[in-house]
């Protein structure tokens, strides 16, 4: 059991949390959601004791073990991969180390013998004899193969380290599990394995994630962090979204009816209050007016940008022909044709394959051999992860930054309107383009793409850095777009709802199927 009592956190004059009372029970998986900056990760740090609250308290059974997904990738560089996973259970490692000390001695005193016996008993209770085997099972499930298990962490690349730290958090059947963005940098196989692990996990789990598909599959409850309060909903992310939108609409409709009724009553009172024959009715209407109450709709920090892509001209039948394209070390003799209406998701375990392919198609990089040809009616807009080329001029504020990509002779109010649609209002539109966060840069690029009105979109991991609200808006924009899209993503919900064709790089070739993402995953099981 884990709960908070009147929990509060204040930085200067800003209250991040105010009198939060919530309880997390065994057997449930809680998704922590909220706008960027709402305090989701900070809340997990309060629960884990990494930071202290300014008021109230966190209550946890001292007998229960809490495990936290760490983000410190370099903290275990001098440890082997297996040992790093075992370090997820500190007490178990302490016992192992103390046992080694006693077994290294030639003889033991009676007291030391008793101590060793106690350690062996506790070691067995903690399933210590299977510890390395259990650690290996977790690693293999997350895609870290046997060849890495006894390598030093310092010799591994960042993506493998992240998986090892996730295995560390999962190790040893913790009573309470706190996971902050656990699916970041996981491929779809590792993500599906993690989903199955959590679905079969019997203890308490709290997760911060921007992956809607993941939250839908594993969560039994949703904790909505908004303006210092946390509201608890029963159900997964999709149920929360639909029910919260329905409740908000019902409140608005109820208020609209109340306002209309109030207007009618006021008009009657104004017309007949001086009329003796109608005075009693006017007084009655006034009493009704006094009883009318408008529902107080609480303000929310959750804001959805407007994202909608329109084509300046409809594309013809010839979109793109790729013929025997080769880039050594990445792909060879790659050939495919893009047809009108295709929304193609590109999948590859090595993300550099897709990045390089997109750069070649955009003319930013040369292929070693082969060719590609765009149709004469195509106009391409793009969003790539490396977007430094657009944000290097320190002189440009957001108004003048977006003006570069706007139709000629557009007014400042036109530019401000577009920025407002992407949640840059008031003084925010005067920000220098070089100081933007990752998510702000992506929203700016999306505004640029909308203004360009291309009929072909190339998008590399477009949901990276975005909050759930922006991801939802982007998903709707890509789904409703009438042109062609070539994209890559780790967001399963986006893949499932947007893609109608999958091109996956496998071995030395590709698999090209007209299929949905879910059907593609099902085909892998056959």
Regions found by a protein language model. Give the residues of each.
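ABC ATP-binding cassette signature C-motif
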Residues: 1-253, 312-526
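Short low-complexity stretches enriched in small and charged residues
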Residues: 22-26, 179, 277-280, 300-303
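Intracellular alpha-helical coupling/juxtamembrane segments of multi-pass membrane proteins
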Residues: 240-268, 272-296
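Amphipathic heptad-repeat alpha-helical coiled-coil/stalk segments that mediate oligomerization
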Residues: 297-321
């Amino acid at each position: 059991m884990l709960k908070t009592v009147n929990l509060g956190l204040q930085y200067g004059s800003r209250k991040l949390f105010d009198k939060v009372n919530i309880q997390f029970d065994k057997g449930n998986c809680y998704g922590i959601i909220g706008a960027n900056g709402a305090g989701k990760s900070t809340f997990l740090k309060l629960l884990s004791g990494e930071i202290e609250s300014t008021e109230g308290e966190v209550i946890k059974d001292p007998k229960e073990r809490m495990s936290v997904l760490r983000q410190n990738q370099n903290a275990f560089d001098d440890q082997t991969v297996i040992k790093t996973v075992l370090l997820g259970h500190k007490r178990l490692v302490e016992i192992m180390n103390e046992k080694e000390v006693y077994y290294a001695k030639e003889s033991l005193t009676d007291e030391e013998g008793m101590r060793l016996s106690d350690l062996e008993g506790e070691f067995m209770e903690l399933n210590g004899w299977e510890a390395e085997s259990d650690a290996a099972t977790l690693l293999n499930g997350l895609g870290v193969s046997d060849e890495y298990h006894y390598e030093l962490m310092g010799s591994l690349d960042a993506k493998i380290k992240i998986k090892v730290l996730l295995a560390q958090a999962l190790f040893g059947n913790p009573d309470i599990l706190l996971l902050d963005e656990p699916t970041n940098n996981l491929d779809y196989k590792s993500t599906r394995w993690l989903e199955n692990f959590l679905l079969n996990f019997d203890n308490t789990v709290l997760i911060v994630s921007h992956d809607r598909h993941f939250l839908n599959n594993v969560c039994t409850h949703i904790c909505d962090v908004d303006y210092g309060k946390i509201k608890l909903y029963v159900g997964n992310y999709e149920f929360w979204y639909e029910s919260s939108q329905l409740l908000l609409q019902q409140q608005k409709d109820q208020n609209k009816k109340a306002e209309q009724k109030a207007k009618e009553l006021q008009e009657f009172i104004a017309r007949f209050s001086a009329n003796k024959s109608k005075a009693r009715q006017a007084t009655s209407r006034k009493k009704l007016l006094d009883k009318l109450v408008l529902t107080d709709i609480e303000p929310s920090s959750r804001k959805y940008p407007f994202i909608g892509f329109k084509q300046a001209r409809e594309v013809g039948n010839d979109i793109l022909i790729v013929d025997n394209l080769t880039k050594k070390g990445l792909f060879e003799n790659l050939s495919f044709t893009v047809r009108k209406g295709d929304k193609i998701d590109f999948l590859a375990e090595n993300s550099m394959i897709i990045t390089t392919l997109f750069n070649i198609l955009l003319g930013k990089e040369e292929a070693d051999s082969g060719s590609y040809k765009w149709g004469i009616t195509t106009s391409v807009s793009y969003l790539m992860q490396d977007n430094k080329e657009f944000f290097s001029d320190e002189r440009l504020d957001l108004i003048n930054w977006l003006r570069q990509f706007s139709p000629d002779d557009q007014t400042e109010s036109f530019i401000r309107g577009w920025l407002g649609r992407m949640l840059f209002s008031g003084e925010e539109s005067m920000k220098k383009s070089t100081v933007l966060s990752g998510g702000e840069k992506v929203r700016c690029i999306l505004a640029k793409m909308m203004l360009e009105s291309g009929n072909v979109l190339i998008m590399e991991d477009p949901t990276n850095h975005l909050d759930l609200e922006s991801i939802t808006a982007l998903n709707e924009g890509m789904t409703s777009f009438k042109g062609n899209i070539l994209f890559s993503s780790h967001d399963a919900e986006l893949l499932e709802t947007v893609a109608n064709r999958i091109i996956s790089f496998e071995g030395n070739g590709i698999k090209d199927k007209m299929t949905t993402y879910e059907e593609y995953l099902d085909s892998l099981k056959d």
